[in-house]
Amino acid sequence: MVCTQRVAGLGHMNLRILENNKGKKVVAVDPVGAREGNWVFTASGSAARFACPNPEVQTDLTIGGIIDYWESN
């Protein structure tokens, strides 16, 4: 994905295309440096702004962290 025009608050923050378990694709701000194939958790809505280093960033989806291990019962 190439995004040349952004709102001022996004600056040079990375953006990632995420796919949920139903196949829906969304774009999220990525302050943690996730890579393709990583499992991540996200913050959405107004909480997404506070997951960014600068809470003034205008976003409604932010990657909050990379999941290193996940066990499902």
Swiss-Prot record:
Domain of life, per lineage: Bacteria
Originating organism: Prochlorococcus marinus subsp. pastoris (strain CCMP1986 / NIES-2087 / MED4)
The protein's assembly and partners: Homopentamer.
InterPro entries reported for this sequence: CsoS4B, EutN_CcmL, EutN_CcmL_sf
GO cellular component: carboxysome
Protein name: Carboxysome shell vertex protein CsoS4B
PANTHER family in alphabetical order: BACTERIAL MICROCOMPARTMENT SHELL VERTEX PROTEIN EUTN, ETHANOLAMINE UTILIZATION PROTEIN EUTN
Family: Belongs to the CcmL/EutN family. CsoS4 subfamily.
Subcellular location: Carboxysome
Major site of localization recorded for this protein: other
Keyword presence, Cytoplasm: no
PROSITE patterns: BMV
GO BP term, pick one: photosynthesis
Keywords attached to this entry: Bacterial microcompartment, Carbon dioxide fixation, Carboxysome, Photosynthesis
Domain named BMV: residues: 1-68
Described purpose of this protein according to its UniProt entry: Probably forms vertices in the carboxysome, a polyhedral inclusion where RuBisCO (ribulose bisphosphate carboxylase, cbbL-cbbS) is sequestered. Has been modeled to induce curvature upon insertion into an otherwise flat hexagonal layer of major carboxysome subunits. Has not been identified in purified carboxysomes; it is expected to be present in very low amounts.
Domain notes: The tight homopentamer forms a pore with an opening of about 3.5 Angstroms in diameter which is positively charged.
